Amino acid sequence: MSTSSESALSVFGAGDINNAAYVRSIIRQGRWTSHTSGLASEHVQGNVVILPADEANDFLRYCQRNPKPCPLLAVSEPGHAGLPTLGADLDIRTDLPRYRVWRHGEVVDEPADISALWRKDLVTFVIGCSFSFEEALMQAGLPLRHIEQQRNVAMYRSNIATEPAGAFHGPMVVSMRPFKASDAIRAIQITSRFPDVHGAPVHMGDPAQIGIADLARPDYGDAVEVLPDEIPVFWACGVTPQAAIAQARPEFCITHAPGAMLITDLLNHQLAAF
């Protein structure tokens, strides 16, 4: 079983770490249970929310009303564990490194396999993830500190409200990456090309303006240092639905664990708008 400090190369091997189907197969075997930042870097990654069918319509409307933090990549039929538009062999019950099981708005377990919990009424939503634009940032020569340090990205609950739908409501969660000023401008330009994976940032600069008191204490993920000559840049984040689930308190729900994403067969460049 992997840990966040263990090198991905020691588990996957240098030759296969960029092969999405191979990475999913290792995850399916339970050999990698950590975050997926930097894995299969050419491939689209997704946040996951799994809800009973009787609550799926409200959540679908929540995503439609909040496309910045909740850009939908795929929605399954009730009870279907496959998502053929995202991967031919994909099985949502086994192919995430770690899941969160929710009951009445509280996380009660974080298993690596949800096969025993699967039900015929469950609907899967896959939401775009900012890990998918990191390849473009790195190709442009922009440093990403969490990848350099083999950490999960830092994520925070902001004071930016989302548009409610049914019982689903709550604050926008944002991910943060520090850049020097010139690199921050370039990062805005690059990520604007990817609206299906959150697009351009929602804020840069003073974190207090969006309700973040201490960058060293993220609500999800791992803290990274922001150097004196750097600016924190914040993107809408697909963990936002988990904040909404905590407010809606559905009887039963499953999500990905923050940072432990679904790796798809889609290529990042396929989502570029221009």
From Swiss-Prot:
Gene3D superfamilies: PSTPO5379-like, PSTPO5379-like domain. Keywords: Lyase. This is Putative hydro-lyase Bpro_1776. SUPFAM superfamilies: PSTPO5379-like. It comes from the Bacteria. Its EC number is 4.2.1.-. It is an enzyme of class 4 (lyase). Belongs to the D-glutamate cyclase family. One of its GO terms (molecular function) is lyase activity. It comes from Polaromonas sp. (strain JS666 / ATCC BAA-500).
